[in-house]
UniProtKB/Swiss-Prot annotation:
NAD(+) binds at G8, A9, A10, G11, R12, M13, E33, G97, S98, T99, A121, P122, N123, M124. Belongs to the DapB family. It is found in: Cytoplasm. The active site is at H154, K158. This is 4-hydroxy-tetrahydrodipicolinate reductase. SUPFAM superfamilies: Glyceraldehyde-3-phosphate dehydrogenase-like, C-terminal domain, NAD(P)-binding Rossmann-fold domains. The lineage of its organism: Bacteria, Pseudomonadati, Thermodesulfobacteriota, Desulfuromonadia, Geobacterales. Its EC number is 1.17.1.8. (S)-2,3,4,5-tetrahydrodipicolinate binds at H155, G164, T165. It comes from Geobacter metallireducens (strain ATCC 53774 / DSM 7210 / GS-15). It comes from the Bacteria. Pathway: Amino-acid biosynthesis; L-lysine biosynthesis via DAP pathway; (S)-tetrahydrodipicolinate from L-aspartate: step 4/4. GO terms for biological process: diaminopimelate biosynthetic process; lysine biosynthetic process via diaminopimelate. The gene is dapB.
């Protein structure tokens, strides 16, 4: 039985991961929160609403990592890298669902993962990862004859923009078309900005209300348009996906993996 520790255990996502881990038959061995959090010392299961687990929420990273097989982290890139470093020192696996990583931060994550198995994915949803595969195939088939635009929608509390999932969708399309995403991504259009270039991939962001997450990639040709969309109705798909990744990654060879590896989509 896999022993899972959860970082950000008192947050919305952390609570759903605890519930998902219990439902999957895993052992919730630890629950981590930032020092000074008001719920430190409380039973993680009671806070998550799944019944007492006998696991107190802790602010001691090293103790939590010591007691687990794998740590699941949905926080921020800065915190995730700190947790990844702690796991690397103790030879424990980690699953990271945080978004907003810069290329430099992602490179550092890959370096730290040389000694342990780690899953880093902007979206743990099975459906979204199937979309990644579909986007690759569609982009290769359509080639340069269709313009590509991406629109993503999230709740008004989301801190980063565009979403990590939207960026990854853009990267997948760019790679399939032989383009450098960082050079062709267009995040801003305003005023007299000139005609759209053939190579660019447009990115639009919407924030409002309680939208869990919606992504649509438009392939726009002359007289026709293809739309590939994914809509998240609940955060449970992310929590279930992260637990699935945690069960998969324990015992794997060191290295940085993503959900395409977990789901066997490569």
């Amino acid at each position: 039985m896999v022993k899972i520790a959860v970082c950000g255990a008192a947050g919305r996502m952390g609570q759903r991961i605890i519930v998902a881990a219990k439902e999957a038959g895993c052992t919730v061995s630890g629950a981590l929160e930032r020092p000074g959090h008001e719920l430190v010392g409380q039973d993680a299961g009671l806070i998550a609403g799944c019944g007492a687990l006998g696991v107190a929420i802790s602010d001691d990273l090293n103790a939590v990592v010591d007691g687990c097989d794998v740590l699941i982290d949905f926080t921020t890139p800065k915190v995730s890298l700190k947790n990844l470093e702690a796991c690397a020192l103790k030879k424990k696996a980690i699953v990271i669902g945080s978004t907003g990583f810069t290329p430099e931060e992602r490179a550092l994550a890959a370096e730290l993962a040389k000694d342990i198995p780690a899953v880093l994915a902007p979206n743990m949803s099975v459906g979204v990862n199937v979309c990644f595969k579909i986007l690759k195939d569609v982009a290769k088939t359509l080639g340069d004859d269709f313009d590509v635009e991406i629109v993503e929608l999230h709740h008004n509390k989301k801190k980063d923009a565009p979403s990590g999932t939207a960026v990854r969708m853009g990267e997948v399309v760019a790679e399939a078309l032989g383009r450098d995403y960082n050079k062709v991504a267009n995040y801003h259009r305003e005023g007299i900005c000139g005609e759209r270039t053939k190579e660019e991939i447009g990115m639009q962001t919407v924030r409002g209300g309680d939208i869990v997450g919606e992504h649509t990639v438009y392939f726009i040709g002359m007289g026709e348009r293809i739309e590939i969309s994914h809509r998240a109705m609940t955060r449970d798909m992310f929590s279930r996906g992260s637990v699935r990744a945690a069960q998969w990654v324990v015992g794997k060879a060191p290295g940085l993996y993503d959900m395409q590896d977990v789901l066997g989509l490569r």
